[in-house]
């Protein structure tokens, strides 16, 4: 008797990407559709929630059909329907949740609600097998966290940002530099052309915990630029980008390496939109390579196309919940403030 393949149709609509995917056995992408809204939000310098919701409504039915067609699947081939239910923009989340619930009720296919952050981390599962326990640095527009995983469904935060997330900081300083939203890719490219000449602060780098603070860096950057404007001094944009990125990468990599030394995970994962940053990817790979062999974890850096918001990562995470029998019912609702649990040590 052959083992039955498990196919999951996944929805993602937590922010400004509408995405659907069909994932087989939690590892194989049979289809992935992403309808981006970046051009609609660029003129505003960031995501406008109402605009995002309207775009989700316009495309979600069509991209659901496209995901099934690309996977050569019908509803009869789908074993579960997965959807991001938080965190994110409440209006945007509701579009995906409503679509997934409607499909589940109409077809009788089980429903699985997925935490968006769990999805970002599980994008690694689409590239390679994760050995547990695992540790992840999750860096995106809304979150900057170090997450410990004892298995595929039990996650706890051991380090968190106390103010700005890394991606948020990139976008805010991007506005100062005149870079279109989203600014991360351009600043990363500029950083590789400049030098760390401004020596911006590395907040909390030597603190005993694994928390982060990026608001001071953001303020120092903005003040430097404003002061230069006042005295009519022209600053090199490449050096500004390099100095900003050096500060972010130094702090993130330093605390991540310390966490690896303490928790000794078998696998290290970099997840989230900022995981596409080449400066961060390169530094972490270099620092982990220097670790002693007995504590050096396997490293999984997700493919660049899976760093941003997408439904494939939601399908991967949902597969683990499916295998554990963790299903949702018709009462599933959007939870814009949904959080992974914090480690007990952080609550003392």
Curated annotation (Swiss-Prot):
What does this protein need as cofactor? Answer: Fe(2+)
Q: Which UniProt keywords apply?
A: Acyltransferase, Cytoplasm, Iron, Metal-binding, Transferase, tRNA processing
- Does this entry carry the keyword Metal-binding? yes
Q: Which domain of life is it from?
A: Bacteria
Where it sits in the cell: the answer is: Cytoplasm
Binding residues annotated for Fe cation, in chain numbering: 116, 120, 309
Q: Which InterPro entries match?
A: ATPase_NBD, Gcp-like_dom, KAE1/TsaD, TsaD
Catalytic activity annotated for this protein? Answer: L-threonylcarbamoyladenylate + adenosine(37) in tRNA = N(6)-L-threonylcarbamoyladenosine(37) in tRNA + AMP + H(+)
- UniProt record similarity statement: Belongs to the KAE1 / TsaD family.
Q: Which NCBIfam families match?
A: gcp_kae1, T6A_TsaD_YgjD
What is the name attached to this protein's record?
tRNA N6-adenosine threonylcarbamoyltransferase
- Record the organism: Lactobacillus gasseri (strain ATCC 33323 / DSM 20243 / BCRC 14619 / CIP 102991 / JCM 1131 / KCTC 3163 / NCIMB 11718 / NCTC 13722 / AM63)
Per the record, the gene is tsaD
């Amino acid at each position: 008797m052959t083992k039955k393949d498990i196919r999951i149709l996944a929805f993602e609509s937590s922010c400004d990407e509408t995405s659907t995917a069909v994932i087989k056995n939690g590892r194989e992408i049979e289809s992935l559709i992403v309808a981006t809204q970046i051009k609609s939000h660029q003129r505003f310098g960031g995501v406008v929630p109402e605009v995002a919701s309207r775009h989700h409504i316009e495309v979600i039915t069509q991209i659901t059909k496209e995901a099934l067609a690309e996977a050569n699947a019908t509803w009869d081939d789908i074993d579960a329907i997965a959807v991001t239910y938080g965190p994110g923009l409440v209006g945007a989340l509701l579009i995906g949740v409503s679509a997934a619930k409607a499909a589940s009720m109409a077809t009788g296919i089980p429903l699985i609600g997925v935490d968006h952050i769990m999805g970002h981390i599980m994008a690694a599962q689409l590239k390679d097998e994760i050995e547990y326990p695992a540790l992840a640095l999750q860096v995106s527009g809304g979150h900057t966290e170090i997450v410990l995983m004892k298995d595929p469904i039990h996650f706890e935060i051991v380090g968190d940002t106390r103010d700005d997330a890394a991606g948020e900081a990139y976008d805010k300083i991007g506005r100062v530099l005149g870079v279109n939203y989203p600014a991360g890719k351009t600043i990363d490219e500029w950083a590789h052309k400049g030098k760390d000449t401004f020596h911006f602060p590395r907040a909390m780098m030597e603190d005993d915990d694994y928390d982060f603070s990026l608001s001071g860096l953001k303020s120092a950057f903005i003040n430097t630029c404003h002061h230069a404007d006042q005295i009519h001094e022209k600053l090199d944009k490449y050096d500004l980008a390099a100095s900003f990125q050096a500060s972010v990468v130094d702090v993130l990599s330093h605390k991540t390496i310390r966490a690896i030394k303490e928790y000794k995970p078998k696998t290290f994962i970099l997840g989230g939109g900022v995981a596409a940053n080449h400066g961060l990817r390169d530094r972490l790979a270099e620092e982990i390579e220097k670790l002693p062999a007995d504590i050096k974890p396997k490293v999984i850096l997700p493919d660049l196309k899976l760093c941003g918001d997408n439904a494939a990562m939601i399908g991967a995470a949902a597969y683990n919940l499916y295998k554990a029998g963790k299903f949702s019912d018709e009462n599933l609702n959007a939870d814009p403030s949904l959080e992974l649990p914090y480690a007990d040590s952080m609550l003392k």
